[in-house]
Amino acid sequence: MIDLIKRLPKAELHLHIEGSLEPELMFRLAKKNQIEIPYKDIEDVRNAYNFTNLQTFLDIYYAGANVLITQDDFYDLTWEYILKCVEDNVIHTEIFFDPQTHTARGVTFETVITGIKRALADAKAQYGITSCIIMCFLRHLSQEEAFETLEQALPFKDDIIGVGLDSSELGNPPSKFIEVFKKAKEEGFKLVAHAGEEADFSYIYEALDLLDISRIDHGVQSIKSAELMQRLKDEQMPLTVCPNSNIELRVFNNYKEHNIKELLDYGLNITVNSDDPAYFKGYINQNFINISENLPLTEDDIITLVKNSFRSSFISDELKQQYLNRVDQAVG
């Protein structure tokens, strides 16, 4: 099974680029930019990656992002992730970034997007890896601030395929952002949102019905509503599930309790992703390995999960078919 996982070409649809900031790069950038970080060494950082819920993770995640200042910093951050893609056979990736995390510190929107974009262009040139960029609004901030961020994104419409919604879920429902999502849709952006990770399944209904999204990030709480499960199945609405993240943030106590196999068996359109891999102990292959070792997943399940990620991506139908053919070739 592990050999199959490593062999298969994959797409990743739920990856926060700031969440791929490894401690080594964090220290290097902190030193270069003369930013104080509350850790004495790399081991100290790894020990701090011991989370009890989404918020305890976010506190550390935002502190880590402080070291990202220049365009080159965002290039290096993205490039290090691309090297992991090469290692894990990811041939298409759709990357989230959180502009508000950076603009709040005085780093310009242009600095962030240009650094990321340059690295992705090099990834295409050197490794043939295709990519899309999705800009996320921070849901703990106001809709008004989200509108400001949307305005900043407009000059970069050609570089950003969609908008999403992330950060602290509890108490920040999708309904808080109806108008800005409506405007984003009018501007031609594709729409996704984190929903049903920690908060209950009502947030998934809101994301579908009020924000009109075309992909749900996480969505594991959907299992608590038979009606919602049936709807997700009927619509083949993609769910970008992140197993390591769910365990690290205590959404499930352990991998054996994870519901990904149940969701898949029900007929939902499920994909596997790494979310914030530097913080959650593993990139995409490790997520696949962890679930395959702890759940009764078959080789066909793994192939389905991989194919779902291409089918649910924002690339052209022609490219999807090319990639699905490559999966079939790898299966042999």
UniProtKB/Swiss-Prot annotation:
Tree of life domain: Bacteria
EC number of this enzyme: 3.5.4.2
A GO cellular component annotation here is:
cytosol
**Annotated catalytic residues:** 197 (proton donor)
What is a biological process (GO) this protein takes part in?
A: nucleotide metabolic process
UniProt entry keywords in alphabetical sequence: Hydrolase, Metal-binding, Nucleotide metabolism, Zinc
The record ties this protein, via Pfam families, to: A_deaminase (PF00962)
Q: How is the cofactor bound?
A: Binds 1 zinc ion per subunit.
InterPro entries associated with the record? A_deaminase_dom (IPR001365), ADE (IPR028892), Ado/ade_deaminase (IPR006330), Metal_Hydrolase (IPR032466)
Q: Where is this site: Important for catalytic activity?
A: 218
One GO MF term on file is:
zinc ion binding
Q: Provide the reaction this enzyme catalyses.
A: adenine + H2O + H(+) = hypoxanthine + NH4(+)
Residues the record lists as binding Zn(2+): 14, 16, 194, 275
Annotated disulfide bonds: none
The residues that the entry says bind substrate are 276
Checking HAMAP family in the record gives:
Adenine_deaminase
Recorded family membership: Belongs to the metallo-dependent hydrolases superfamily. Adenosine and AMP deaminases family. Adenine deaminase type 2 subfamily.
Role, per record: Catalyzes the hydrolytic deamination of adenine to hypoxanthine. Plays an important role in the purine salvage pathway and in nitrogen catabolism.
What protein am I looking at?
Adenine deaminase
Q: What species is given as this protein's source?
A: Psychrobacter cryohalolentis (strain ATCC BAA-1226 / DSM 17306 / VKM B-2378 / K5)
Q: Give the lineage.
A: Bacteria, Pseudomonadati, Pseudomonadota, Gammaproteobacteria, Moraxellales
